[in-house]
Structures are given as structure tokens and as C-alpha cells.
Amino acid sequence: MSMYNYVKEAWKVPANSYVKELQWARMQDWRKEPSVIRIERPTRIDRARNLGYKAKQGIVVVRVSVRRGGLRKPRPKHSKKPATMGINKITMAKSIQRIAEERAAKKYPNMEVLNSYWVGQDGKQKWYEVILVDPCQPSIKNDKSYNWLCKGTHKGRVTRGLTSAGKKGRGLMYKGKGAEKARPSVRANGKKTK
């Protein structure tokens, strides 16, 4: 088995491998860090490389922490019945992973999100590592596996739900029975003439 396979097997169930102790120590530092922080190298090298990471100029990995659970909505200042305030039990239509990708893109506006993966969670928050690519970097423009990102059609792809996490949330990972109303999008499908 290759080194990447050993790492992959260990991360399948982190609680049953050496990853548990590593995560326990790491998270103590992660909690003190800012919510979006650039890191030198990926925590899960197998997953990062599988999703398109290469150690070269123009590619950056960022760790993002996002709250767990439902949406944290502000309480209305004007009086309302508690039942109609809409504070508790409000869930975002986006996944937490998608929120993490968007926050990373907002922090680095000159870069495009390639992909992201889970690296840990505790009772309060989840951590994701987001792979960002600089489309203006010459080494990216000359690489066939990345230069498709340099086209204008991929600008702001994360906010348009074009990453893997975005497509999953829009129902575009499925085909056939049960997915008839997902294309071209849920909203556009309702507007189609019968």
C-alpha cells in the first residue's frame, strides 16, 4: 500500500486511528486562530491531491472555521410574538462546507476556489480546508490541468454554486429518477413552459 493509502485509511474513521490524538492537539491551536487562515501545507495530503492540489506557485490552502448547527439570526429589536420572530430552528439552504468556501473566496478576492474538504469538528464549529488557485499566475496559465480556471466563465464560481459542494447542494450530483426538477436549476425548472 502506498503512503497516500495509509493516510486515507486513517482518516476514514479518525476516532479509531492515530488521527484522534493529532486532532485533539491541533484543535486547541485552531480554536485560537482567526476564522480564515492561510496554511503552509494541507492537513490531509491524500484528500488535497485527490481534489487537485499541487505544491506549486499560484495554489494556496486556507483553513476556515464555520459554526455548527442552525443559522445564528439576530433578534428583532421591535416587539413581535416570539413564535413569529424567526430566530431559532432556522436552517440555511447552503451547506456549511459551501459557506466555508465562500468565506475563503471573500478573503482572497484575486483567487478562485478549486475545491474543499473536511478536516475536523468539535461541539461548536467545523473546519474545512479550501484549495484556492490564482488564475493570473503564469505557472497556472501554462498548466493544462488548471488553465481552464483562467477563463472568464469561471470567475466567482464559488458564489454561483459551481464547486463540488455547490453542485451537491443544488441537486446536480444526481441524474434520472428523482432529479427531474433539478435542471437547469430548481428556480429555472419552475419557470419552464409546459
Curated annotation (Swiss-Prot):
Keyword terms, alphabetized: Ribonucleoprotein, Ribosomal protein
Record-level GO BP terms: cytoplasmic translation
Region (Disordered): 161-194
Domain of life: Archaea
GO annotation, cellular component aspect: cytosolic large ribosomal subunit
PROSITE patterns (alphabetical): RIBOSOMAL_L15E
Keyword Ribosomal protein: yes
Keyword Cell division: no
GO MF terms held by the record: RNA binding; structural constituent of ribosome
Disulfide bonds: none
SUPFAM superfamilies, A to Z: Ribosomal proteins S24e, L23 and L15e (SSF54189)
Family assignment from sequence similarity: Belongs to the eukaryotic ribosomal protein eL15 family.
Protein name (database record): Large ribosomal subunit protein eL15
Organismal lineage: Archaea, Methanobacteriati, Methanobacteriota, Methanomada group, Methanococci
